[in-house]
Amino acid sequence: MKLTTVLVVALLVLAACQFTVTDNSGDDPENPSLRSAGENQNPDSTKTITAWATRDMTNMRRGLNRPSKRCLAGSARCEFHKPSTCCSGHCIFWWCA
């Protein structure tokens, strides 16, 4: 019984940490203190530019000239099979994380 309780508590702590990290992983220019000190503070980082270029190329292949939005913010509805439409890249139960 004691071992089961310890395992359940450990699982809950790990789940809470995962949701906290996911919630704070977005690029929030209004509150840069949420980011780690070693992270690149430039919003036009190579990773962001590469992601935008990939989405733009995908839209060109589909016949769309311009995407209506670059990505969906957190707490927005998303397509479960297309998590790349979320800014964070995570679509959990049809909501951007």
From Swiss-Prot:
Location, primary (coarse class)? secreted
Superkingdom to which the source organism belongs: Eukaryota
Compartments, as annotated in UniProt: Secreted
Q: Residue ranges of region Disordered? A: 22-46
The stretch of residues making up the signal peptide is 1-22
Keyword list (alphabetical) reads: Cleavage on pair of basic residues, Disulfide bond, Ion channel impairing toxin, Knottin, Neurotoxin, Secreted, Signal, Toxin
Transmembrane found in the keyword field:
no
**Domain note:** The presence of a 'disulfide through disulfide knot' structurally defines this protein as a knottin. The cysteine framework is VI/VII (C-C-CC-C-C).
The entry's family comment says: Belongs to the conotoxin O1 superfamily.
The molecule here is called: Conotoxin Cal6.1b
Query: Which species is this record about?
Result: Californiconus californicus
The uppermost taxa in this organism's lineage are: Eukaryota, Metazoa, Spiralia, Lophotrochozoa, Mollusca
